[in-house]
């Protein structure tokens, strides 16, 4: 039995001298100082790696001893993980850091079944853990030759801004709860069931704007550590959904922004969407990207994303404001926006996750959550059944996720052609469970273009077109995977020439009126749109430094949207929607037809050929 000395020091005698963003802010009301003691599990004389796969630490919380069990998060980075920043003269600098022996862990508290932890062990212990239903943060002091750490409850961190923080996603034409309740009862085809059962992988890229670079004093290492800690927590949140979020790239706009990052979150999302599809995806293969910005979005918005867009070459993105020094809060927001990409909508009052608030709540709770609700899980399940996004089946473990290959663990790893589990449990005729190689004559195990262990014939449709702006995909005869979901070129006429395709959708004013006002709504007369020349809350085109800029006469149909309600008892032929906390809502969406042959682009009504 190892004798462990645990010391708690009176706070008055131990002024903070560390480097923590949270503690340095002076916003922590109360914390205790502890000395975590590592309890080694390695035998005497064994070679100690720098960061072991599993570790235990003992320390006290509120005078009671706790044992923190940690396991290295081997799914955090992909092997081809790369980092990009820019030199002062604008040159792109790409590096491939060695991340095999990283220091990021998930964990739990001994004898607490409801506990969890996300910890960086790079220089002391930094992160958070849940103990007896309460969230605690732990951070090391920056003191010479000291193992002292601060432990404090999340509730003891004073909030600089008590205003509610909201997700900017505001679609109102969401499906009712009834179909969601029935989603788990659907009769699934064998292919659908196989897709649901397969482990999913999101190859994830984080982009930081120039404001973030300046916020962290041009310190690339400090920025990287923060992102690693955040994604480590994100990764943990998706484990119960059988999804591994693997960081495959980090891009830092150290020279200057690649897009116009503005306080109008919807506009910034559109610009980042276009940049990702036209630029980033061509340089770095990935499934999903998020922009983390220091820009303060208008109103209470702190994030925004496209719903049901995972794997889309443009729309699989989100944008997030770095609004808090608490990594858990930002990680929860990033997980929330990725949840939208995976088909999840906001929770309502009937949704539960066993905590006061869940990840997909529209407003960020004072009690941060790491749990997805039952509604979120059913939304995601229904989205996966209907769309079966193929990029999630790309198994980064084959060449990317760092983990020693073990045949029989049902994870496809380096050197394996398949892995169906142990010989006793494997029922797959395409895979040899003993060797993790394909059986003789087999070409594949699973995929939309795999049928009875063979590739489907060239030209076999594997994904039908969903609407006017989508395109069908067909098997190549050379792969088990259905090709990446593609869509009509931007500017292609859609919905009987009432609109033009834009990033795979057909935005029309009529549909936007129905979404905002109600099922009987129609687009208002042209005269109503003249109010957009006033430059006030109810009529403008753009904002500059918080000031509403009037529309030019030719651009009035690219500002605030005006609708005719047409509901019984309503007599408002020029109705517009204005939300002070989310001013972007109610504006005509980018790509919307504003005249024959013209679309809204950057809040101007321009020729389709000019826009695209």
UniProtKB/Swiss-Prot annotation:
<comment type="subunit">
    <text>Monomer.</text>
</comment>
<feature type="disulfide bond">
    <location>
        <begin position="407"/>
        <end position="436"/>
    </location>
</feature>
<feature type="binding site">
    <location>
        <position position="471"/>
    </location>
    <ligand>
        <name>Ca(2+) 3</name>
    </ligand>
</feature>
<feature type="binding site">
    <location>
        <position position="346"/>
    </location>
    <ligand>
        <name>Zn(2+)</name>
    </ligand>
</feature>
<feature type="active site">
    <location>
        <position position="337"/>
    </location>
</feature>
<dbReference type="InterPro" id="IPR006586">
    <property type="entry name" value="ADAM_Cys-rich"/>
</dbReference>
<feature type="binding site">
    <location>
        <position position="419"/>
    </location>
    <ligand>
        <name>Ca(2+) 2</name>
    </ligand>
</feature>
<feature type="disulfide bond">
    <location>
        <begin position="541"/>
        <end position="551"/>
    </location>
</feature>
<feature type="disulfide bond">
    <location>
        <begin position="430"/>
        <end position="453"/>
    </location>
</feature>
<feature type="domain" description="Peptidase M12B">
    <location>
        <begin position="200"/>
        <end position="396"/>
    </location>
</feature>
<keyword id="KW-0862">Zinc</keyword>
<keyword id="KW-0800">Toxin</keyword>
<dbReference type="InterPro" id="IPR036436">
    <property type="entry name" value="Disintegrin_dom_sf"/>
</dbReference>
<dbReference type="GO" id="GO:0005886">
    <property type="term" value="C:plasma membrane"/>
</dbReference>
<dbReference type="Pfam" id="PF01421">
    <property type="entry name" value="Reprolysin"/>
</dbReference>
<keyword id="KW-0325">Glycoprotein</keyword>
<dbReference type="GO" id="GO:0046872">
    <property type="term" value="F:metal ion binding"/>
</dbReference>
<keyword id="KW-1199">Hemostasis impairing toxin</keyword>
<feature type="disulfide bond">
    <location>
        <begin position="462"/>
        <end position="482"/>
    </location>
</feature>
<feature type="binding site">
    <location>
        <position position="411"/>
    </location>
    <ligand>
        <name>Ca(2+) 2</name>
    </ligand>
</feature>
<feature type="disulfide bond">
    <location>
        <begin position="494"/>
        <end position="506"/>
    </location>
</feature>
<comment type="similarity">
    <text>Belongs to the venom metalloproteinase (M12B) family. P-III subfamily. P-IIIa sub-subfamily.</text>
</comment>
<dbReference type="InterPro" id="IPR002870">
    <property type="entry name" value="Peptidase_M12B_N"/>
</dbReference>
<dbReference type="InterPro" id="IPR034027">
    <property type="entry name" value="Reprolysin_adamalysin"/>
</dbReference>
<dbReference type="InterPro" id="IPR001762">
    <property type="entry name" value="Disintegrin_dom"/>
</dbReference>
<keyword id="KW-0106">Calcium</keyword>
<feature type="disulfide bond">
    <location>
        <begin position="594"/>
        <end position="605"/>
    </location>
</feature>
<feature type="binding site">
    <location>
        <position position="406"/>
    </location>
    <ligand>
        <name>Ca(2+) 2</name>
    </ligand>
</feature>
<keyword id="KW-0479">Metal-binding</keyword>
<keyword id="KW-1204">Blood coagulation cascade activating toxin</keyword>
<feature type="signal peptide">
    <location>
        <begin position="1"/>
        <end position="20"/>
    </location>
</feature>
<feature type="glycosylation site" description="N-linked (GlcNAc...) asparagine">
    <location>
        <position position="260"/>
    </location>
</feature>
<feature type="binding site">
    <location>
        <position position="409"/>
    </location>
    <ligand>
        <name>Ca(2+) 2</name>
    </ligand>
</feature>
<feature type="binding site">
    <location>
        <position position="470"/>
    </location>
    <ligand>
        <name>Ca(2+) 3</name>
    </ligand>
</feature>
<protein>
    <recommendedName>
        <fullName>Zinc metalloproteinase-disintegrin-like berythractivase</fullName>
        <ecNumber>3.4.24.-</ecNumber>
    </recommendedName>
</protein>
<feature type="disulfide bond">
    <location>
        <begin position="351"/>
        <end position="375"/>
    </location>
</feature>
<keyword id="KW-0655">Prothrombin activator</keyword>
<feature type="disulfide bond">
    <location>
        <begin position="513"/>
        <end position="563"/>
    </location>
</feature>
<feature type="glycosylation site" description="N-linked (GlcNAc...) asparagine">
    <location>
        <position position="348"/>
    </location>
</feature>
<keyword id="KW-1015">Disulfide bond</keyword>
<dbReference type="Pfam" id="PF08516">
    <property type="entry name" value="ADAM_CR"/>
</dbReference>
<feature type="binding site">
    <location>
        <position position="394"/>
    </location>
    <ligand>
        <name>Ca(2+) 1</name>
    </ligand>
</feature>
């Amino acid at each position: 039995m190892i004798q462990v000395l645990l010391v708690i020091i009176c706070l008055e005698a131990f002024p903070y001298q560390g480097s923590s963003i949270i503690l340095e802010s002076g916003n922590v009301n109360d914390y205790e100082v502890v000395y975590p003691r590592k309890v080694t599990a390695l035998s005497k004389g064994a070679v100690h790696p720098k960061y072991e796969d599993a570790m235990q630490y003992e320390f006290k919380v509120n005078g009671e001893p706790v044992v923190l069990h940690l396991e290295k998060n081997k799914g955090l980075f992909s092997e081809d993980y790369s980092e990009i920043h820019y030199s002062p003269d604008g040159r792109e600098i790409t590096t491939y850091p060695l991340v095999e022996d990283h220091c990021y862990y998930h964990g739990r508290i001994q004898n607490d079944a409801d506990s969890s932890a996300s910890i960086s062990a790079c220089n002391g212990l930094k992160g958070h853990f849940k103990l007896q239903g309460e969230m605690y943060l732990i951070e090391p002091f920056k003191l010479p030759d000291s193992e002292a750490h601060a432990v404090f409850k999340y509730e003891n961190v004073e909030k600089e801004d008590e205003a509610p923080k909201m997700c900017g996603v505001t679609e109102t034409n969401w499906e009712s709860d009834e179909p969601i309740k029935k989603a788990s009862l659907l009769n699934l085809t064998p292919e659908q069931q196989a897709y649901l059962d397969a482990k999913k992988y999101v190859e994830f890229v984080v982009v930081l704007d120039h404001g973030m670079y300046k916020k962290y004093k041009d310190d690339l290492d400090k920025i990287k550590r923060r992102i690693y800690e955040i994604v480590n927590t994100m990764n943990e949140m998706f484990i119960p959904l059988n999804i591994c979020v693997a960081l495959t790239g980090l891009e830092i706009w150290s020279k200057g922004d690649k897009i116009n990052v503005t306080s109008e979150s919807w506009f910034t999302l559109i610009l980042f969407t276009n940049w990702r599809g036209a630029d980033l995806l061509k340089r770095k293969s990935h499934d999903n990207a998020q922009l983390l910005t220091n820009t303060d979005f208008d109103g209470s918005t702190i994030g925004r994303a496209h719903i049901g867009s995972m794997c889309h070459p443009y729309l699989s993105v989100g944008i997030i404001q770095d609004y808090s020094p608490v990594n858990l809060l930002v990680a929860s927001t990033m997980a929330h926006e990725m949840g939208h990409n995976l088909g999840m909508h906001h929770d309502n009052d009937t949704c539960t996750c066993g905590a006061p608030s869940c990840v997909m709540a529209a407003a960020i709770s004072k009690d941060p959550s790491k749990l997805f609700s039952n509604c979120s899980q059913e939304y995601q399940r229904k989205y996966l059944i209907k769309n079966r996004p193929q990029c999630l089946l790309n198994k980064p473990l084959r060449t990317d996720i760092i983990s020693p290959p073990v045949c029989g663990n049902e994870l496809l790893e380096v050197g394996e052609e398949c892995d169906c589990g142990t010989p006793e449990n494997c029922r797959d005729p395409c895979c040899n469970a003993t060797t993790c190689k394909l059986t003789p004559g087999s070409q594949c195990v699973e995929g939309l273009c795999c049928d009875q262990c063979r590739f489907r014939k060239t030209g076999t449709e594997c994904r039908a077109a969903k609407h006017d702006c989508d395109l069908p995909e067909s098997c190549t005869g050379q792969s088990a995977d259905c090709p990446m979901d593609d869509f009509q070129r931007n500017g292609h006429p859609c919905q009987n020439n009432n609109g033009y395709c834009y990033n795979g959708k057909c935005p029309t004013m009529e549909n936007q009126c129905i979404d905002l006002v109600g099922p009987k709504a129609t687009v208002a007369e042209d005269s109503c749109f003249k109010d957009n020349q006033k430059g006030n809350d109810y009529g403008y085109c753009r904002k500059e430094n918080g000031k509403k800029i009037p529309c030019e006469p030719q651009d009035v149909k690219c500002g605030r949207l005006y609708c005719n309600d047409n509901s019984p008892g309503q007599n408002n032929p020029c109705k517009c929607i204005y939300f002070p906390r989310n001013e972007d809502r109610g504006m005509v969406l980018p790509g919307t037809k504003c005249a024959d042959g013209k679309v809204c682009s950057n809040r101007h009504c321009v020729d389709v050929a000019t826009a695209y």
